[in-house]
């Protein structure tokens, strides 16, 4: 029983995961811990999964595990290379809009809701009110962290089902360089408040060609642990938007370094690390298009992915189930996985011909209302990257398959 042996080893050796679990148990508010267990583990992964499977079979379409949505396109910062900034800053989903999305989602077994933006905490009061109304759901928000204060942390303690993932770019120089002078100190203050009040939170980090060494260093992992973060979610820079800086795309050598470094840190540091782009092997490739999540922007447009702003569905005009049956979402359903090598999972970044075909076939339009980007322009920025990454991805993929074969042989 491999999993049982791993659990026994974790306890016996007092390894990094043992330390992580012990710190979570000892340092998290017990009522918050109980609510996370009920909403995330029981509702989101046991009760909800059964309902989702029923809908998948009945309607022959994707049903997501989580819904990402933008309460607002407004933000108090303007970060370099931010895909969300492309939407402008005057759009909002009303309280009733979000309430309806969540209500519909729960009917299909969806209990996980993730706020993006814009800066979601511009809508603090509505976010807390939604947590109260839907106290059987787990809410997470990607946030720059600058609007987290004592009062909001107390509200988090009251509702118990809200968790922030705070965006940082590394240490002070890198964070302030991309997010604005003084941002880092505000973020550190927010994390101090959360840690003091025994509220769990994580880190969201975007790696680029410019920050990849510092943001993945052992020292940075130690700093995140010191801040009190329980997880870190790494995102590969995406060249989305007409003005995207393609020079920020990591080189194949840098991405390969991240592939190995994150796996190394997982075995050494007491924080759970995820890499949205390089961990495709654990989730069967692309999870967008409603396979595990979709994205609803502040205008109500339903994008298959938070990074792919094309759609022919709007939540104001159709139900959530109808969105999942719309042309672009069905194209994802029918086309996934987009590559058998799950280190090349994305129909845009690593397989740009796929998203071009999907958009043209389904007649999807750009949902970027401020500066619409043609799919040809988007794909043109990815073609060279995809070509350069393919040999490295194929090498790594074959090595991983061989490792798995050898491990399976040893367990016989």
Describe each model-derived feature in a short phrase:
Residues 10, 75, 79-82, 286, ...:
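Short cysteine clusters
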Residues 60-62, 66-95:
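Canonical Radical SAM [4Fe-4S] cluster-binding loop centered on the CxxxCxxC motif
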Residues 307-412:
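Flexible mid-to-C-terminal extensions adjoining Fe-S/redox cofactors in radical SAM and related proteins
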Residues 15-68:
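N-terminal [4Fe-4S]-dependent radical SAM core
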Residues 43-64, 274-276, 280, 314-330:
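Short, charged low-complexity linear segments at domain edges
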Residues 95-115, 121-235:
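Radical SAM/AdoMet-radical enzyme domain recognition
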